[in-house]
Amino acid sequence: MAVAIICLCGCAPDDIDISGYADQQIAIDGIDEDTVFVSIADMKALDCVTIKTESTSDKIGKVRATGPTLETVLAAKGADIKDIKKITFHGADDYEYSLKEDYIAEHDIILAFGIDKEPLDEEDAPCRIIIPESDSAYWLRMLDHINIEMK
């Protein structure tokens, strides 16, 4: 069974050097008529959490992920996570998956810019989705686009 610990203090996002991908942006469609963007530097400036977790599939092992929650990022862009009907995450490697409102309501979704107190590796950057206590298939790498369908 996966164990998740969420810390709001001491996550020390400033300790993670994102300089190699700080300016990379994630496109978000569905909040407004126009696509909005959030850079990794913008995300690092938000309230961040640190999660210690392990995927239920044990394919990845234990990680300590740091970044803002999806809810925090959306709030910074003027959207409420409770108004989402469906969300689709897209990776630069063409991997994608969707989550419906019931799953979103029941799980914390972390947009991690650091793993184990280190910047993301090239194959994971600029952002990795981490959903504690979930299968690693939901831990999308190289996030570059989020598509939101509002209620």
Please report, for each region that a protein language model flagged, where it lies by residue.
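N-terminal intrinsically disordered, low-complexity segments enriched in P/E/S/T
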Residues: 11-151
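C-terminal motif of bacterial Sec signal peptides marking the signal peptidase cleavage site
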Residues: 6-10
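Sec-dependent N-terminal signal peptides
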Residues: 1-3
